């Protein structure tokens, strides 16, 4: 089987019923940072403590404007001697222009890697399948491994899965090895798994709209409140220590006559009436017809609240439990 992306689209499946699946991640992009100042420069730009990031760890963090609003969130890790991050392709160009603003004063080279191949490996027996190709696999304790031109990231949520950053040659080998027993799918399958995991999806429509805590990044250990200064730090800290954040990320599931787009609002049932509320970050329809919506809503919303896609008289969406706690130490 010849390697080419994106893989043919299939309706996404929830993690509990997902067979071994290779997923082309064309809706995501890879960026690398190299040079002597790569750590120092990024430390002043993102919410995570880059000084504390080890070579066998990855972190989801935020890149904010001066008001603490996220240009993007980034899945950050070491790749070779340099740093790398993965973000949604829809906002790549704008986010990079913001990240590079002061790079001319530092010894750092920040550049997209359009030739890199990103493949998700998920579903039943994902680890066993990868073990046939890679001698060392990442784990919960050591979620990043490097082998030659390949970097493997391990995710525990919503179920064990892997993200492979590699070149075309290695991708071809993986596809050939697993072609007889794996399904293939496009980016929407990985998107569904991220929604189920409660990992915030920031696309261009929602860039510079939310502080990190409105999308639960603090609950995913993506914000350091003890590191030095970074762009937007004052507003991010205020949200924690002064209780300024009134929003949170939610996972909703139910039925809808259409899949809402990023940036749309939803409707919340109040007695006999419906009131507009929140912002959709991402949404997907599964193979069984269920619609999943990831949205930013008021963080005091009752767990039994009924919502729906805007103007969808026949649909209802219910809040689903996230696989992590939002309880915070003050």
Curated annotation (Swiss-Prot):
Major location (coarse): cytoplasm
Transmembrane segments: none
Superkingdom classification of source: Bacteria
GO MF, one annotated term: folic acid binding
Gene Ontology terms: cellular component: cytoplasm
Keyword check for tRNA processing: yes
Coiled coil regions in record: none
Alphabetical UniProt keywords: Cytoplasm, Folate-binding, tRNA processing
Subcellular location: Cytoplasm
Function: Folate-binding protein involved in regulating the level of ATP-DnaA and in the modification of some tRNAs. It is probably a key factor in regulatory networks that act via tRNA modification, such as initiation of chromosomal replication.
Protein's name in the database: tRNA-modifying protein YgfZ
Source species taxonomy: Bacteria, Pseudomonadati, Pseudomonadota, Gammaproteobacteria, Enterobacterales
């Amino acid at each position: 089987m010849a390697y080419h992306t994106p893989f043919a689209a299939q309706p996404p499946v929830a993690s509990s019923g997902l067979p071994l699946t290779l997923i082309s991640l064309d809706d995501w992009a890879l960026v690398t940072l190299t040079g002597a100042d790569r750590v120092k420069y990024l430390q002043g730009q993102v919410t995570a403590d880059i000084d504390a990031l080890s070579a066998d760890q990855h972190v989801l963090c935020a890149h904010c404007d001066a008001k603490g609003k996220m240009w993007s969130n980034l899945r950050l890790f070491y790749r070779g001697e340099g740093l790398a991050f993965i973000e949604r392709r829809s906002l790549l160009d704008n986010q990079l222009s913001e990240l590079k603003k002061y790079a001319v004063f530092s010894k750092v080279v920040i550049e997209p890697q359009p030739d890199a191949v990103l493949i998700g490996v998920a579903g039943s027996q994902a680890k066993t399948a990868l073990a046939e190709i890679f001698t060392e696999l990442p784990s919960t304790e050591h979620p990043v491994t490097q082998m030659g031109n390949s970097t493997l990231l391990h995710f525990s949520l919503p179920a064990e899965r892997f993200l492979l950053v590699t070149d075309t040659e290695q991708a071809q080998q993986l596809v050939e090895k697993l072609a007889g027993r794996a399904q293939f799918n496009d980016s929407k399958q990985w998107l569904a798994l991220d929604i189920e995991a409660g990992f915030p999806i920031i696309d261009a429509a929602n860039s510079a709209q939310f502080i990190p805590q409105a999308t639960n990044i603090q609950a995913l250990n993506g914000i350091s409140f003890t590191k030095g200064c970074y762009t937007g730090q004052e507003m991010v800290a205020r949200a924690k220590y002064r209780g300024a954040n009134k929003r949170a990320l939610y996972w909703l599931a139910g039925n809808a006559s259409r899949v809402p787009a990023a940036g749309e609002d939803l409707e919340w049932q109040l007695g006999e009436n419906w009131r507009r509320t929140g912002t959709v970050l991402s949404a997907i329809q599964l193979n069984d017809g269920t619609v999943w919506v990831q949205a930013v809503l008021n963080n005091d919303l009752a767990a039994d609240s009924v919502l729906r896609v805007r103007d969808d008289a026949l649909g209802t969406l219910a809040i689903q439990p996230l696989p992590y706690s939002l309880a915070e130490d003050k």
